[in-house]
Amino acid sequence: MTSPQTSSLDDIFGSSPPHEDEKFSQRPSIQAPEPSDLPSLRRQHVTAGYRDGVSAAKGEHVQHGFDAGFPIGAQLGMRAGTVIGIIEGLLRGFENRTASRAVKKPLQWKEEGQGTEADEAEAARQAKREQLLRLYQKAVKELEVRSVFAGSEEGSTRDNEGQEKPEVVLRRKGDAVISQWEEQVRVAQWEENMAALEPKEDEQRASTSTEQI
């Protein structure tokens, strides 16, 4: 007969045979087989959830980008259009003046020394027109939307490390480009002149309508 002391030591050092309950607990658990269609259903649900999440997030961010970016683009576009419109108006003015002079001048025989001043004035006018044409072509190229915002995304990532909002970077980039052209074309002076001419045009329309009545 084994003494209680020996039995307790056997339990500590593992020399005693395992108990029945220990044998039962060490048996590997047998999992129930998973239905064959369950993995396929799981993949379908994961895919559907992923697509819904992408659609919801994309729609939200697209709308936010539109709300934040559209006013900036519209404002800068109006400023760029003003610059191009002023140059184009000047260019058309030179073209119309040259065409009217060509129609009004009859073909005449010129004596030696005559017409020198007129020829010089016409040459200066043509040179001015060519200068305006080059300026117009340059403005159209540099104020194109891709040129205005070129490098704004790279600059935001490199310099600000994403701390500034994209629309803020776009506004600053576009303003820097367009402001240079506004100073070169003197847009502020043109707007003042146009504002001064508007009341006169309104008075002329009012007087014309009164005379017709």
Swiss-Prot record:
Record InterPro entries: Essential_protein_Yae1_N, Yae1-like
Organism superkingdom: Eukaryota
GO annotation terms (biological process): protein maturation
Coiled-coil residue spans: none
Annotated region described as Disordered, given as residue ranges: 1-42, 194-213
Annotated keywords: Cytoplasm, Nucleus
Protein's job: The complex LTO1:YAE1 may function as a target specific adapter that probably recruits apo-RPLI1 to the cytosolic iron-sulfur protein assembly (CIA) complex machinery. May be required for biogenesis of the large ribosomal subunit and initiation of translation.
Name assigned to this protein: Protein yae1
Gene giving rise to this polypeptide: yae1
